[in-house]
């Protein structure tokens, strides 16, 4: 198959499509256009275009919407939105709905069910009454936003129409304001229930209740309780519509309890699959480890993308984490990939859907969040990375391809054994023609031609693709000036790599390895990494780079705008990157130093949890001053100490207490030998100790602040020795007899760390002169370490010594490095 890349003009030139793109990419607060806007949005599929349409939407005898006896504004809105001829389900269901009957509508995915209830709702409105008359519920926020866009597009000719969407992730104050003047309310069950409870939404005025994807809304354990609550608050005299592509028999019978003599509108109930959709499956090897199966499926997916030409593809996964991981893998391979899942915020989800519908991405990795109701007409390939849990989900997933009678392709990857048997049961239940994927994949597997609205050009064998500037020259100049001002500030002598790469170093190739972000741990003494010298430069050079980059960006933007004005057309599409499968990539190797940097970055910030470094050795010379990270200070309150005491007492047995007391006594012996071996000059220094306990480090540093109720006296050498002996013996006895006093003593004993630290700070200055031998130097530090832990009677360090978890961490890190080296080989 000849290598080809798909490229289209860079920007839309018509005001209609430009405003549609801005509307879809806007934040949640601006998802709704005003109904009085002078532009119209095309929502319907272009059935008169070059794409093939099957019998799912094409009628044997042509008909039009005027034969359905709709009002004039609705007919004009349908024509403006692009609806030319009704589909079979629209032709049968709209007249029954206009008669006021309760309907249960079942039709194949992508055959125009949203237009059915949107037309019925708009034609039954009384615009002079500004109360909420129609309530539409959808299982996901994305479906609710899509329904709102269809209603506003069809109702563009209805003056004064107020239709709003109410979903989670938006402020309640905004919903309260919109409900003061709202004809049609579209939303998710959770937010609608909340608005009714807060008396923001008056359910007494609702005359039409619509359930889109009714089988999902009434599914047990999903939204059933919320739907029942909302239904009980609505008036008894109302019309109700239930719409879905799949209806289990049990659920269809249960729907009759909500309705008054409902009318079933079913098209092809025995054959729910689309005519123009080819369905394949591929069996992969099964492994005990899940990540091995995922790796093999990913390899098959990349091979499929490289051999099957497609417009847009949807890849479904059963797990959120696996979907995001797959999106990262495909993005690293060069595929324009986006990811959408339920754990993303609302702005990210709407942005991903806007990119899919506006053809700004070729591949969308998703969970079952987008398996229902989402309409993207250019999607002609659906891949199930995991087998769905039920046949309804499978039918909704594959229904994202082949929209409105077009041709499409679906591939399902299943493991050998259980998943394969589950896939066969789904095929038997749905009466579908499921075929094994040919190996090798033939060139003509995708029947639909790709040149219907995409320009095909020969692929260029390049290793770096130029980035397309998406901002205006004025904004680029402002960003460069802000970056230059930040470099000249006295506090920022070392510019961050992020600013330099965004401004003066914008010409860096795309495939270069990015810098790993490093967080500054001010409380731990870890400084942020400075930029390389060649990137920072002097202010004069930086200013010259800024001027040059501004001039080049302005010239490039002006030339691009002139070129676009010549080549663009009203029916063109936004420019997107081409698939990397048609390019030759340069192999990249990593050095051991880069692997170590990657490992340290993963340990510190890989899981987005900052790591506090409590011990940081920078050499004997750097230890003479105040350490950056600081030793354990008196930061534990009495409540925290009481919690530590209770937790240690519940987990420690009697034998643990004995071992701790013996360990303390042995450490006190080491303390005695250390104090006897100390220098005479250190003992001659005046050492003031309070009767109630030694001073804390904060009290020593703040000499002006005198502590209350503390008396000072001289502490000779004998008192220091006796205090350590008695303190070690009394701690082991009092830990058994009076555990309540242990917490207060523990808080008092922590300032001993500070006094030891003051003494240690004075003695370390002479270590470099006294201990010239390397072994003797570390032996002195070992004695100081024993002295420190003898003074710190903290259960944290006891548990650390009793449970050596550092060995487990060492083995884990060893295995991690071995796996990385093995993968590199």
Swiss-Prot record:
The keyword Kinase does not apply. Its EC number is 3.6.1.15, 3.6.4.13. Residues 508-518, 733-744 have a biased composition (Basic residues). A motif (Q motif) lies at residues 63-91. Residues 646-668 have a biased composition (Low complexity). It comes from the Eukaryota. Keywords: ATP-binding, Cytoplasm, DNA-binding, Helicase, Hydrolase, mRNA processing, mRNA splicing, Nucleotide-binding, Nucleus, Phosphoprotein. Residues 94-265 form the Helicase ATP-binding domain. SMART domains: DEXDc, HELICc. It is an enzyme of class 3 (hydrolase). Belongs to the DEAD box helicase family. DDX20 subfamily. A motif (DEAD box) lies at residues 212-215. Its main location: cytoplasm. The modification Phosphothreonine is found at residues 552, 689, 706. The keyword Lyase does not apply. It comes from Mus musculus. Part of the core SMN complex that contains SMN1, GEMIN2/SIP1, DDX20/GEMIN3, GEMIN4, GEMIN5, GEMIN6, GEMIN7, GEMIN8 and STRAP/UNRIP. Part of the SMN-Sm complex that contains SMN1, GEMIN2/SIP1, DDX20/GEMIN3, GEMIN4, GEMIN5, GEMIN6, GEMIN7, GEMIN8, STRAP/UNRIP and the Sm proteins SNRPB, SNRPD1, SNRPD2, SNRPD3, SNRPE, SNRPF and SNRPG. Interacts with SMN1; the interaction is direct. Interacts with GEMIN4; the interaction is direct. Interacts with GEMIN5. Interacts with SNUPN; the interaction is direct. Interacts with PPP4R2. Interacts with FOXL2. Interacts with NANOS1 and PUM2. The SMN complex catalyzes the assembly of small nuclear ribonucleoproteins (snRNPs), the building blocks of the spliceosome, and thereby plays an important role in the splicing of cellular pre-mRNAs. Most spliceosomal snRNPs contain a common set of Sm proteins SNRPB, SNRPD1, SNRPD2, SNRPD3, SNRPE, SNRPF and SNRPG that assemble in a heptameric protein ring on the Sm site of the small nuclear RNA to form the core snRNP (Sm core). Residues 465-475, 484-504, 547-571, 698-711 have a biased composition (Polar residues). It is found in: Cytoplasm; Nucleus, Gem. Pfam families: DEAD, Helicase_C. One of its GO terms (cellular component) is transcription repressor complex. GO terms for biological process: negative regulation of cell population proliferation; negative regulation of transcription by RNA polymerase II; oogenesis; positive regulation of apoptotic process; regulation of steroid biosynthetic process; spliceosomal snRNP assembly. This is Probable ATP-dependent RNA helicase DDX20. It catalyses: ATP + H2O = ADP + phosphate + H(+); a ribonucleoside 5'-triphosphate + H2O = a ribonucleoside 5'-diphosphate + phosphate + H(+). GO terms for molecular function: ATP binding; ATP hydrolysis activity; DNA binding; DNA-binding transcription factor binding; histone deacetylase binding; protein domain specific binding; protein-macromolecule adaptor activity; RNA helicase activity. Residues 27-50, 465-573, 642-753 are annotated as: Disordered.
């Amino acid at each position: 198959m000849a290598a080809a890349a798909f490229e289209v003009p860079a920007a839309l030139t018509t005001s209609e499509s430009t405003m549609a793109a801005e509307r879809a990419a806007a934040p949640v607060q601006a998802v709704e256009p005003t109904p009085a806007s002078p532009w119209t949005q095309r929502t319907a599929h272009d059935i008169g275009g070059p794409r093939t349409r099957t019998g799912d939407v094409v009628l044997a005898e042509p008909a039009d919407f005027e034969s359905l006896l709709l009002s004039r504004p609705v007919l004009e809105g349908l024509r403006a939105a692009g609806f030319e001829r009704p589909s079979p389900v629209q032709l049968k269901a709209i007249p029954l709905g206009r008669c006021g009957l309760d309907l249960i509508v079942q039709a194949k995915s992508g055959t125009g069910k949203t237009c059915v209830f949107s037309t019925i709702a708009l034609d039954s409105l009384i615009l002079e009454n500004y109360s909420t008359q129609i309530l539409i519920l959808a299982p996901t926020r994305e479906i609710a936003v899509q329904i709102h866009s269809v209603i506003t597009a069809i109702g563009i000719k209805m003056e004064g129409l107020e239709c709003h969407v109410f979903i989670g992730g938006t402020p309640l104050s905004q919903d309260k304001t919109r409900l003061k003047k709202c004809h049609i309310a579209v939303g998710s069950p959770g937010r609608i229930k909340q608005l009714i409870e807060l008396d923001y939404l008056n359910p007494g005025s609702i005359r039409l209740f619509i359930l889109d994807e009714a089988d999902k809304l009434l599914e047990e354990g999903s939204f059933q309780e919320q739907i029942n609550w909302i239904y009980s608050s609505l008036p008894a005299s109302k019309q109700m519509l239930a719409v879905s592509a799949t209806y289990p028999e049990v659920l269809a019978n249960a729907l009759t309890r909500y309705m008054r003599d409902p009318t079933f509108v079913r098209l092809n109930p025995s054959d729910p699959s689309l005519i123009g959709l080819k369905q394949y499956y591929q069996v992969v090897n099964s492994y005990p480890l899940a990540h091995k199966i995922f790796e093999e499926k990913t390899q098959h997916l990349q091979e499929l993308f490289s051999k099957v030409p497609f417009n847009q593809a949807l890849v479904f996964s059963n797990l959120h984490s696996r979907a995001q991981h797959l999106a990262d893998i495909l993005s690293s391979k060069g595929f324009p990939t986006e990811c959408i899942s339920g754990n993303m915020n609302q702005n990210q989800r709407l942005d991903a859907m806007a990119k899919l519908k506006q053809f700004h991405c070729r591949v969308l990795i998703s969970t079952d969040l987008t398996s229902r109701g989402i309409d993207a007409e250019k999607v002609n390939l659906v891949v199930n990375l995991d087998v769905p849990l039920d046949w309804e989900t499978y039918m909704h997933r594959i229904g994202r391809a082949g929209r409105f009678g077009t041709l499409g392709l679906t591939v399902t990857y299943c493991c050998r054994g259980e998943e394969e048997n589950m896939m066969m049961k789904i095929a038997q239940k749905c009466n579908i023609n499921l075929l094994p994927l040919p190996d090798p994949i033939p060139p003509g597997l995708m029947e639909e031609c790709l040149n219907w609205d995409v320009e095909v050009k020969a692929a260029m064998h390049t290793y770096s693709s130029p980035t397309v500037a998406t901002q205006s020259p004025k904004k680029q100049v402002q960003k460069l000036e802000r970056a230059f001002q930040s470099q000249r500030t006295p506090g920022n002598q070392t510019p961050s790599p992020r600013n330099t790469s965004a401004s003066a170093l914008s010409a860096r190739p795309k495939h270069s390895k990015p810098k790993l972000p490093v967080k500054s741990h001010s409380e731990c003494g870890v400084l942020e990494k400075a930029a390389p010298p060649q990137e920072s430069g002097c202010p004069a050079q930086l200013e010259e780079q800024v001027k040059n980059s501004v001039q080049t960006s302005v010239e490039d933007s002006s030339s691009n705008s002139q070129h676009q004005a010549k080549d663009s057309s009203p029916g063109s599409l936004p420019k997107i990157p081409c698939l990397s499968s048609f390019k030759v990539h340069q192999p990249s190797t990593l050095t051991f130093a880069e692997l170590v940097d990657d490992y340290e970055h993963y340990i510190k910030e890989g899981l987005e949890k900052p790591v506090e470094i409590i011990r940081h050795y920078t050499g004997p010379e750097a230890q003479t001053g105040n350490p950056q990270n600081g030793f354990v200070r008196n930061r534990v309150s009495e409540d925290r100490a009481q919690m530590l005491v209770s937790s240690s007492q519940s987990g420690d047995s009697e034998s643990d207490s004995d071992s701790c007391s013996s360990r303390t006594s042995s450490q006190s012996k080491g303390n005695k030998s250390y104090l006897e071996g100390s220098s005479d000059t250190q003992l001659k220094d005046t050492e003031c100790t309070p009767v109630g306990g030694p001073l804390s480090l904060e009290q020593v540093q703040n000499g002006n602040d005198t502590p209350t109720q503390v008396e000072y006296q001289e502490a000779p050498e004998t008192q220091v020795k006796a205090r350590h002996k008695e303190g070690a013996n009394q701690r082991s006895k009092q830990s058994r007899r009076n555990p309540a006093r242990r917490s207060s003593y523990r808080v008092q004993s922590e300032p001993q760390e500070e006094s030891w630290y003051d003494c240690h700070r004075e003695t370390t200055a002479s270590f470099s002169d006294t201990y010239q031998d390397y072994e003797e130097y570390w032996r002195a530090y070992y004695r100081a370490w024993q002295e420190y832990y003898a003074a710190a009677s903290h259960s944290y360090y006891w548990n650390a010594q009793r449970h050596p978890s550092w060995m487990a961490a060492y083995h884990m890190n060893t295995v991690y490095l071995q796996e990385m080296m093995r993968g590199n080989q």
